[in-house]
């Protein structure tokens, strides 16, 4: 059957430029073919007769591919599952109607009616009565908020120039909590917190609810600071421990919080102001300058004492360079370290008895003939002995208590 059907179909490769190259090609060929020297005539007359009759089978073939498409589209257009579901639902409804006919008695009807009434009443209680409650609560909250916002909107309690920002609008719960805390407990001012540079940051909000006028508190603070600054200038040299609290720099934010605490405590208990002394920044500068003058060693009567105080600095430099020199020396490390240890012990002894250190500086100048070291301002007088060093470059002076060890000279080490 396939042979006869394929003979009625023209070959596709004839339309191509090379033509059909297959010798045993089953399809119909209207042109002769030459395949590798083999001549093949066109198809026979039997195929032509079949070709005339191609109209009927072609129509049947054109209808054949449409049939499977219709079969595929049928379940989409006619779903059987929905029909079965509808039928089942109808059957269930019929069964319910039949059961209702059997069970409908006056007692059961009353029970169903009572159940429906109970459900309706419960729905009214839980659903229909809640919106009025919500509306009433909403109508009450704005009035309460307006009453609480009135003292804040006046602006008399707000302080200008302060880095603290007071919120103008708060929720009802926060306002009630703050009012309770301000009424039940007094605001606490800790003196130790002021000494450590801190303060109670929540005090300004409590000041507002207590009704304290902060403009008056600021004027009182200015008067207190002026009086206390005059007292501290008079009592600079007094060794009282309370004045030492005012000689320490405090950050500006902590000073603001602490001054607010002081103003609050001054309103409550004026006697407590004797413990804390607020000081402005210019007074801190004077205290800092006085401390610097005290630390500088400029008031010594003798220049020898000044040299004795600053003498350990060149000694540390010379010992550092000497240790580096001894590390680089070969085959003589142990002897050099032992010699340096004995020498440092001998040189530290006269430094306690004699503050001028005349021989001490000479010993260092002889021991280190390096010209690249920059001399300090305290040892410049003893370090300018260049002529004496040129005469005896390797001479060394030893004290009485110092031991003299023979120095081995190896590989050009001095």
UniProtKB/Swiss-Prot annotation:
UniProt-listed Pfam families: DUF5571 (PF17732), zf-CCCH_3 (PF15663)
Signal sequence region: none
Start and end residues of each stretch annotated as Disordered: 136-168, 297-333, 346-414
Residue spans of biased composition, Basic and acidic residues class: 399-414
InterPro entries: DUF5571 (IPR040943), Znf-CCCH_3 (IPR041686)
GO terms classed as biological process: poly(A)+ mRNA export from nucleus
Domain of life: Eukaryota
Compositional bias annotation for Polar residues: 350-359
Entries under PANTHER family matching the protein: RIKEN CDNA 1700017N19 GENE (PTHR15725:SF1), ZN-FINGER, C-X8-C-X5-C-X3-H TYPE-CONTAINING (PTHR15725)
Name of the protein: Uncharacterized protein C12orf50
Encoding gene, per UniProt annotation: C12orf50
């Amino acid at each position: 059957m396939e042979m006869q059907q394929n003979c009625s179909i023209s070959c596709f490769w004839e339309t191509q430029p090379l033509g059909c190259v297959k010798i045993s090609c089953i399809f119909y060929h209207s042109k002769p073919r030459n395949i590798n020297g083999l001549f093949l005539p066109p198809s026979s007359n039997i195929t032509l007769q079949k070709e005339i009759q191609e109209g009927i089978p072609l129509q049947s073939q054109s209808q054949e591919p449409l049939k499977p498409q219709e079969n595929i589209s049928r379940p989409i257009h006619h779903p059987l599952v929905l029909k079965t579901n509808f039928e089942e639902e109808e059957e269930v409804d019929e069964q319910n109607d039949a059961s209702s006919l059997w069970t409908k008695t006056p007692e059961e009807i009353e029970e169903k009616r009572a159940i429906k009434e109970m459900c309706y009443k419960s729905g009214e209680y839980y659903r229909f009565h809640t919106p009025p409650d919500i509306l009433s609560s909403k109508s009450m909250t704005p009035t309460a908020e307006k009453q609480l916002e009135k003292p804040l909107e006046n602006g008399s309690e707000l302080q200008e120039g302060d880095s603290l920002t007071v919120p103008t609008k708060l929720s009802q719960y926060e306002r009630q909590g703050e009012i309770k805390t301000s009424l039940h407990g007094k605001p606490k001012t800790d003196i130790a917190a002021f000494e450590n540079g801190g303060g109670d940051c929540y005090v300004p909000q409590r000041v507002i609810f207590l009704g304290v006028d902060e403009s008056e508190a600021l004027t009182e603070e200015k008067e207190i600071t002026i009086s206390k600054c005059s007292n501290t200038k008079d009592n600079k040299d007094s060794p009282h421990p309370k004045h030492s609290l005012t000689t320490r720099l405090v950050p500006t934010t902590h000073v603001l919080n602490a001054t607010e605490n002081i103003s609050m405590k001054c309103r409550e208990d004026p006697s407590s102001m004797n413990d804390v002394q607020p000081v402005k920044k210019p007074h801190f500068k004077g205290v800092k300058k006085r401390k610097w003058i005290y630390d500088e060693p400029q008031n010594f009567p003798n220049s020898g004492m000044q040299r004795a105080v600053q003498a350990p600095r060149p000694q540390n430099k010379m010992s550092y360079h000497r240790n580096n020199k001894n590390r680089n020396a070969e085959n003589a490390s142990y002897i050099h370290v032992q010699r340096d240890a004995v020498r440092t012990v001998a040189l530290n002894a006269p430094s306690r008895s004699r503050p001028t250190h005349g021989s001490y500086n000479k010993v260092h100048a002889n021991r280190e003939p390096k010209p690249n070291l920059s001399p300090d301002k305290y040892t410049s007088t003893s370090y300018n002995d260049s002529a004496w060093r040129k005469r005896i470059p390797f001479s060394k002076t030893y004290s009485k208590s110092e031991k003299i060890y023979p120095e081995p000279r190896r590989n050009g080490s001095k």
